[in-house]
Amino acid sequence: MKKILLLVMLGLSTSVFSQQTEKTTELEEVVITATRSEISLEDSPIPTEVIGKKEIEQLNLITMQDLLQAKGIQVAPMKSGGFQLRGLSSEYVLVMIDGVPIAGRESGALDLSNINLANVERVEIVKGSMSSLWGNHAIGGVINIITKKGGKPSFQLNTQYGTNNTSLIGLSGNFGKDKFQNVSKVTLGNSDGFDSDPNTYGQTVLPSSLLNISNRSTYSDGVNTFSLSANYFNKDSKGETVTETNTAGQLIETTEENTSDNLILDLNYKRVFGKYVSEIKLSNSSFSNSNKASFEFFGQDVERLDESTQNIFQPEMINSYNWNEKNQTTLGFGMRDYTYDTERYGGERNLGSSFGYLQHYLNLGKLNIIAGGRFDSYSEFGSNFSPKISAKYDVGKFSFNTSIGSGFRVPDFRTMYLTLGGYSQGFYVLGSELIEDEINFYQSNNQIAFLTYDINDINSLSAETSVSYDFGVSYKINQRSKIGVNVFQTNTTDLIESVFVGQFINQTILFGYTNINDATFKGIEFEGLY
């Protein structure tokens, strides 16, 4: 069973990686996500793609999900969202707004269709393992959505209209005086959704409306900088769709209503002491979701309501020291408290962690090196250290870059506490923390026909760990243009997957979760900037 799963994953991982990206941007653009401090995109040895303000405006898209899809990233056209970066699903990609993790993962996927692009300054996509700096969920990379910071006093009214009766209206204003600046934006949007298969019941993407409200206030005297930002995202959708059950793949015609809300608060204080910069960051990211589904099941009308809330609270201190123009050291530490409340997981669940990281950036002209590591300690899964080193060497118009780094992802609440289906429903899915007691109960009542796994293999999960390798070469045509190719591979240990555990005497199938054998994801990608 484990070997079959491994072969399937290898097949998937090599079939979706080849992509070509094009963008109109300056090679001298500054990036921050790969190092937690500003460096030139051209100098960065870590593969990073920047989608700038001008390109976002030229593409004339509505949501963050649309933007990723336009840039060649595979996106699932479903309410649950989800995407793939270098063949790894969104479970392995950390997504942030201004460096703050976005809460709202459902079944590992993160829906970005509720984030409008009107307030987005640029998007930085860092590819490859970044657990050495960002920790959990960053095995496949990091997507950092950077919002607009304000500017000259102005007032704007913007409208957009597109296919599927997609409309958008936005109102924004910048104002400030001397050391104080404020930028506010309100955006309203509507869409009729779309149906990729008219021969089936319902729509692929349901009709929806969205509301985005953002505000950032900043005070700076050149030495001290205070900033407070708030981003609120709401999405409502309603319509007819289909739900696939685990009983012989039966499709159920369903009327669905879904409401989701994100609120991200970020309070920052930064002080410059000559070559030393210290920053205190206090953030809170919350998410709530309500899903109501009405359908007919075996001749009976059924109404199902699923509600959930999530919250990520994270205080952090970031310190950087510029030894000279060629050397910069970054040291940071903090803690994270993650809470998830839903009946599917048996009520409120909590996962706490603390972390610290150290990184050094060395620029020797033709040779640039970034080396560092991060230590994470979890209340339930122990500790993990994730080192990484990256280098870039320039020879004439050619540049060679390479990286090797480790990553990790701890089990999520779904794989530990999920309860789905039941003994009398044809299928039963249980998280690792619950399955042993249920098996013991049904075995004592002689209700289990057979098991395919030993209980000790499915009653506890370990964190996934990985080692990623990256090698690339690029050719600089001129100041604005270059072409390149990157070869990469990620070797993952203790991959967490759902597995067939056994069967009850009434033919109900039992599923659980376990750490399967090692898996490898590898591929090649081409890049073109002009």
List PLM regions with ranges:
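Extracytoplasmic beta-strand/coil segments of soluble accessory domains associated
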Residues: 48, 65-101, 121
